[in-house]
């Protein structure tokens, strides 16, 4: 086992604080509308330019192992805030730095670290409760656009495109962010349920100009097995021929004789038909077939539940207003399923998503939920260069997370004002000794730090701005974007409550642990021994050369 180096007491705390400051100082320059960019060197490709706190934090590794421990603990604050709310990483880092700095000063002055931590924890619990009372619902499109704009560093186009996407696919709908080909941002909305399976034969195409199949008011047959025998399909096809309506077959596969007969029938105009493979694999395929069945009011024909394809009738088929099938995708628009059943299915999938421990499963469940609930929106980010594209895409993703958080828990006044108001309301938290009281003071002072930093990044004196805001009331605050004071909500400067809450909770949690640290253990860095000159040893044999003379 390698030898270890141990630091105790003040020596450990000084090193840890140095690491905290290096990371936090690099991150906090990005805070606010006038925050600066940070350039990150990449081992390959162009450098990355970003204003995203967590992206900066993740890049930082320090040479001194003890300083690095401090930096890594603050990095954890940013990562946790990012995982929980998708934004607020810089705010969380600023809060953590303030709590650690003030806390370690108090410990050096002889206060009890455990009591300080208890005081900080009490203040945070009271602050979270107060934040909830200040929170206002974020329901309308305008408020959603404002939240997105603030999170995207005052880029109104990003806020507006996210608000439009949410309006079109619903607040539960799936919104994805991709790199686009144009200079401007674009929004593509897929209404209805789309899955990534195209037609099984190009002979089904009835719209040659677009290379797609379009079926108006079709019946939809859902089969959880491979279909290769045409006899199994005959009863359904005969029933359909009488109605004159088209048919979409969604099955594990349609092959051989069955596919050939369907193609011939389609080309002769006897029955308008198209076939696609069912989406997904294994259990996920069964679940997605059931989703389509509920959306279209049909029944999945599966032998394991005693239903045979030969005995299926028109009553077992689902229906929709329209189906569009391309080479790669199938879209079912306006399925005629019962709304109550669709809502129940969405609720069931939501519970599964909440209980799932796998990120991949969660993502797939949320996609299924969105497809049932309304559709999928794709924001295509436009930029002139690859460097700008990466920076812009990160901002759009941040803004999207922030708007989702705002819809979930509401909004509070932005620009660090909410935390200042909370601090003034909870000044009298109940404590049992002076050290705990000082812990509360440390937390309250930290709650002013984001506002001070926003002002400092805008070139103003943080203390003066903080004092002016404290003298006001309600949503009165400082707009660093145009250097004015006023009602933050009226100026459209909003922060999601969830983002502010998460930042405070994670910062206090990890900073509290750092304050109570008394020793640090790290590996001794051993210098690699210099390579010896052993390779020259073979020259000794030269002595025998004398015999040659």
Curated annotation (Swiss-Prot):
Q: What class of enzyme is it?
A: isomerase
Under catalytic activity, the entry for this protein gives: ATP + H2O + a folded polypeptide = ADP + phosphate + an unfolded polypeptide
Chain residues that bind ATP: 30-33, 51, 87-91, 415, 495
Stated EC number for the protein is 5.6.1.7
Q: Where in the cell is it found?
A: Cytoplasm
The entry's cellular-component GO terms read: cytoplasm
**Keyword Transcription attributed:** no
- Cite the InterPro entries for this sequence: Chaperonin_Cpn60_CS (IPR018370), Cpn60/GroEL (IPR001844), Cpn60/GroEL/TCP-1 (IPR002423), GroEL-like_apical_dom_sf (IPR027409), GROEL-like_equatorial_sf (IPR027413), TCP-1-like_intermed_sf (IPR027410)
Q: Name one GO molecular function term.
A: isomerase activity
Q: Principal place where this protein is found? A: cytoplasm
Q: Which UniProt keywords apply?
A: ATP-binding, Chaperone, Cytoplasm, Isomerase, Nucleotide-binding
Answer yes or no on keyword DNA damage: no
Gene3D superfamilies, alphabetically?
GroEL, GroEL-like equatorial domain, TCP-1-like chaperonin intermediate domain
Could you give a single Gene Ontology term from the biological process aspect?
Answer: protein refolding
Functional summary from the UniProt entry: Together with its co-chaperonin GroES, plays an essential role in assisting protein folding. The GroEL-GroES system forms a nano-cage that allows encapsulation of the non-native substrate proteins and provides a physical environment optimized to promote and accelerate protein folding.
Q: How does it assemble?
A: Forms a cylinder of 14 subunits composed of two heptameric rings stacked back-to-back. Interacts with the co-chaperonin GroES.
Family according to the record: Belongs to the chaperonin (HSP60) family.
Q: PANTHER family of this UniProt entry?
A: 60 KDA HEAT SHOCK PROTEIN, MITOCHONDRIAL (PTHR45633)
Protein name per its UniProtKB record:
Chaperonin GroEL
């Amino acid at each position: 086992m390698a030898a270890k180096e141990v630091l105790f007491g003040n020596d450990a705390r000084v090193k840890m604080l140095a690491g905290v400051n290096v990371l936090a100082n690099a991150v906090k320059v990005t805070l606010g509308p006038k925050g600066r960019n940070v350039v990150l060197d990449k081992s390959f490709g162009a450098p990355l330019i970003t204003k995203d706190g967590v992206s900066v934090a993740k890049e930082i590794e320090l040479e001194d192992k003890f300083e690095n421990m401090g930096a890594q603990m603050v990095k954890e604050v940013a990562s946790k805030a990012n995982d929980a709310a998708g934004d607020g990483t810089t705010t969380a880092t600023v809060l953590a730095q303030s709590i650690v700095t003030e806390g370690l000063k108090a410990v050096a002055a002889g206060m009890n670290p455990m009591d300080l931590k208890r005081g900080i924890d009490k203040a945070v619990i009271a602050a979270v409760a107060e934040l909830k009372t200040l929170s206002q619902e974020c329901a309308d499109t305008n408020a959603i656009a404002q939240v997105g704009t603030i999170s995207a560093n005052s880029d109104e186009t990003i806020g507006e495109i996210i608000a439009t996407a949410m309006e079109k696919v619903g607040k539960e709908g799936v919104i994805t962010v991709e790199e686009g080909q144009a200079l401007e941002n674009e929004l593509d909305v897929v209404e209805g349920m789309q899955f990534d399976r195209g037609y099984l034969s190009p002979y089904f195409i009835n719209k040659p100009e677009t290379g797609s199949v379009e079926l108006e008011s079709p019946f939809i047959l859902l089969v959880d097995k491979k279909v290769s025998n045409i006899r199994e399909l005959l009863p359904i096809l005969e029933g359909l021929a009488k109605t004159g309506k088209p048919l979409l077959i969604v099955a594990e596969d349609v092959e051989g004789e069955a596919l050939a007969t369907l193609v011939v029938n389609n080309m002769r105009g006897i029955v308008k038909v198209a076939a696609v493979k069912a989406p997904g694999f294994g259990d996920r395929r069964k679940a997605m077939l059931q989703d389509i069945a509920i959306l279209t009011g049909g029944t999945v024909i599966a032998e394991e539940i005693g239903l045979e394809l030969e005995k299926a009738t028109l009553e077992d088929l689902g229906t929709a207003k329209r189906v569009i099938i391309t080479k790669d995708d199938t879209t079912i628009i306006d399925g005629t399923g019962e709304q109550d059943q669709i809502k129940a299915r969405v609720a069931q999938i939501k519970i599964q998503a909440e209980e799932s421990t796998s990120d991949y499963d969660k993502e797939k469940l949320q996609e299924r939920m969105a497809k049932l609930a309304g559709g999928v929106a794709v924001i295509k980010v436009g930029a002139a260069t690859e460097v700008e594209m990466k920076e812009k895409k990160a901002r759009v993703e941040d803004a999207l997370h922030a708007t989702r958080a705002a819809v979930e828990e509401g909004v509070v006044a932005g620009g660090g004002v909410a935390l200042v108001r909370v601090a003034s309301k909870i000044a009298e938290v109940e404590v049992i000794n002076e050290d705990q009281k000082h812990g509360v003071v440390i937390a309250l002072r930290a709650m002013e730090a984001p506002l001070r930093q926003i002002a400092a990044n805008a070139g103003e004196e943080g203390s003066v701005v903080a004092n002016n805001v404290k003298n006001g009331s309600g949503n009165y605050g400082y707009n660093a974007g145009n250097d004015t004071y006023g009602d933050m909500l009226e100026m459209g400067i909003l922060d999601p409550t969830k983002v502010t809450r998460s930042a405070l909770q994670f910062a206090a949690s990890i900073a509290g642990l750092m304050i109570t640290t008394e020793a640090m253990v790290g590996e001794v860095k051993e210098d690699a021994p210099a390579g010896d000159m052993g390779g020259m040893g073979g020259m000794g044999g030269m002595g025998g050369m004398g015999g040659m003379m």
